[in-house]
Design a protein with these regions (language model features):
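Phosphate-binding and adjacent anionic-ligand microenvironments
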Residues: 1-103, 107-111, 118-145
């Protein structure tokens, strides 16, 4: 359901389809069956519109180089790097971090999630925060975890 979080109508259709595929189960039953995940709020450090896409390009190169060289984040190798609309890196246990340019504000967007532990979300955020501090173009976060 992760990719549906930004569109209410698409989410509603997906929920109805899940209910249709699972006759005899309520929405509450289906929700209880979902695995627990530990996610962050959307965190947005300032980055000027004219700078943010260049910063993201450099972050993409940095994360890809780390993945290629076997570097770790929270003690886990980066097993996937998705560069569609920013960079999303996935770790061995399925935990991930996302850094992208906001499409409508002078900010970057940072989100992290782990299927295994809250401490992993905090650790991934600390790694992203460390990376972003290296860029003078990136300001303070609006919130942190």
């Amino acid at each position: 359901i992760e990719h549906l979080q930004n569109c209410g109508l698409v989410s509603a259709v997906a929920i109805l389809q899940m209910l249709d595929r699972n006759p005899g189960k309520s929405f509450a039953d289906l929700r209880r069956a979902l695995p627990t995940t530990y996610g962050s709020p959307t965190m947005s450090p300032y980055c000027a519109d004219e700078e943010k896409y260049g910063v993201i390009d450099r972050i993409i190169a940095e994360v890809q180089a780390d993945a290629d060289s076997g570097q770790t984040v929270i003690g886990q190798k980066i097993v996937d790097v998705n560069t569609v609309n920013g960079v999303r890196f996935t770790l061995e246990d399925g935990s991930w971090g996302l850094i992208r340019a906001s499409s409508n504000t002078p900010n970057l967007v940072v989100v992290v999630e782990s299927p295994t532990a809250k401490k992993n979300t905090v650790g991934i955020f600390r790694d992203i925060e460390r990376r972003l501090k290296a860029y003078n173009e990136v300001g303070e976060f609006d919130q942190k975890i």
